[in-house]
């Protein structure tokens, strides 16, 4: 039972198993929700089949359960939400808030990577075209509950970004906003690598006339080369053995109170301790390099 209107979520993509960096995002969002006696949901962001690894989604859910991170309600699968995305696209089109773009990627690269609105007034049809938002509400800054006021790159914030890809796939920024609104998410706790797209997502909330959630961007776990731990750079999967030492590592990474007697606790007791003593203000804002992160699963 909860007595709070707080709703948080963890939304991994099934491009591989969870690693230590994933655990930081999952644990941070879980603790922030549970400390406020709120709801914590899980969503599988499986809208990009070329990047998905067969069986990864089921493994991710097993990993969360193994680490004691039990979610509320049913898992939401983006692959089952296409109709909702189509309805959102149709509404934007009807309101004159989107347009078709046939510009090749090479042209945008020549512009320095920021689209210049070339197709905005050309009235292209849908054939072999992407759909771009007609930016009406650029967001130049936003408040992060951990980091304070974050300023956006003005060019990035003002860009007419893609919401439906030329290959027929729904863009991440559209899907995440539609789903967070649908699930009633009140605060999004995720990694700092997602700070940049936040202003685009906030502008979509304004386009739709929806209330936006709050944001917390956690520090990233880096490998010994200074790169973010990720599935793309082959970060090792989380341990399938005793999850407690890895949870303790993750809590230390998040700047939380040390669990001195964790060996005497069950996973459930360890997490209850972490919820009771959770302090968002103790979380560092800088990324952290530690060789142990690369070995957290070994």
From Swiss-Prot:
Cofactor binding mode and count: Binds 1 zinc ion per subunit.
Binding residue positions for Zn(2+): 101, 103, 115, 119
Motif ('HIGH' region): 12-22
Pfam families for the chain: tRNA-synt_1c
Gene3D superfamilies: HUPs
Residue sites binding L-glutamate per the record: 9-13, 45, 172, 190
GO CC terms, sorted: cytosol
Swiss-Prot/TrEMBL cofactor(s): Zn(2+)
UniProt-listed GO biological process terms: glutamyl-tRNA aminoacylation; tRNA modification
Record carries keyword Membrane: no
Residues binding ATP: 231
Family: Belongs to the class-I aminoacyl-tRNA synthetase family. GluQ subfamily.
Known role: Catalyzes the tRNA-independent activation of glutamate in presence of ATP and the subsequent transfer of glutamate onto a tRNA(Asp). Glutamate is transferred on the 2-amino-5-(4,5-dihydroxy-2-cyclopenten-1-yl) moiety of the queuosine in the wobble position of the QUC anticodon.
Protein name, entry field: Glutamyl-Q tRNA(Asp) synthetase
Gene (name only): gluQ
């Amino acid at each position: 039972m909860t007595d709070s209107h707080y709703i948080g979520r963890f939304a991994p993509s099934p491009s591989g198993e969870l690693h230590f960096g994933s655990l930081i995002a999952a644990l941070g969002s879980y603790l922030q929700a549970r400390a406020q006696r709120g709801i914590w949901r899980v969503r599988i962001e499986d809208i990009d089949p070329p990047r998905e690894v067969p069986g990864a989604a089921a493994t991710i859910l097993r990993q969360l359960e193994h680490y004691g991170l039990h979610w509320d309600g049913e898992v939401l699968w983006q692959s089952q939400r296409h109709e909702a995305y189509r309805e959102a696209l149709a509404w934007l089109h009807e309101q004159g808030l989107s347009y078709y773009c046939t510009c090749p990627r090479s042209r945008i690269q020549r512009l320095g990577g920021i689209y210049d609105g070339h197709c905005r007034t050309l009235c292209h049809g849908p054939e072999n075209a992407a759909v771009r938002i007609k930016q009406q509400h650029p967001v130049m800054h936003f408040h992060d509950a951990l980091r304070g006021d974050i300023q956006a790159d003005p060019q990035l914030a003002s860009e007419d970004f893609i919401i439906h890809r030329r290959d027929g796939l729904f863009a991440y920024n559209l899907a995440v906003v539609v789903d967070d609104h649908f699930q009633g998410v009140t605060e999004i706790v995720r990694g700092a690598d997602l700070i940049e797209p936040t202003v685009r997502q906030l502008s979509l909330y304004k386009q739709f006339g929806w209330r936006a959630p709050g944001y917390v961007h956690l520090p990233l776990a880096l490998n010994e080369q200074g790169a973010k731990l990720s599935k793309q750079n082959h970060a090792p999967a989380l341990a399938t053995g005793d999850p407690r030492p890895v949870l303790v590592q993750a809590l230390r990474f998040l700047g939380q109170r040390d669990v001195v007697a964790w060996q005497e606790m069950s996973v459930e007791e360890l997490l209850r301790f972490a919820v009771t003593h959770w302090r968002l203000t103790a979380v560092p804002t800088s990324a952290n390099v530690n060789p142990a992160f690369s070995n957290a699963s070994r």
